[in-house]
């Protein structure tokens, strides 16, 4: 596992849900590659965030936040998740995967494998 920066904490307003891109080097056998992965960050309070993997737990399609319905939605097969990542509708077998996070000098760091 490694910790990678997801952005400055103050760029995520309290009460917001945002998609942001993280970039890191993933090692595979004898080589490594740079991977760019979108994640979802929800900011509840000044110091409280929840970071989600943005892949639907059904087949891995991208999930996005719909501010009108206030839920995460997957356009591929109609999957829907509540603000906490719990399944509301569709075929997803489990909630959205959460990413461990920490604040380090004002930067949100997320743990990736």
Language-model features, listed with the residues they occupy:
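N-terminal pre-ligand scaffold of iron-sulfur
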Residues: 1-57, 61-66, 95-113
């Amino acid at each position: 596992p490694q910790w990678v920066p997801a952005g400055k904490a103050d760029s995520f307003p309290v009460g917001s849900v945002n998609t942001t891109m993280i970039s890191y080097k993933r090692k595979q056998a004898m080589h490594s590659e740079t991977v760019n992965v979108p994640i979802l960050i929800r900011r509840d309070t000044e110091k409280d965030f929840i970071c989600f993997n943005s892949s639907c737990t059904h087949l891995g399609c991208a999930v996005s936040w719909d501010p009108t319905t206030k839920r995460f939605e997957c356009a591929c097969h109609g999957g829907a998740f509540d603000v906490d990542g719990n399944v509301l509708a569709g075929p997803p077998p489990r909630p959205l995967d959460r990413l461990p996070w920490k604040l380090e000098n004002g930067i949100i760091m997320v743990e990736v494998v």
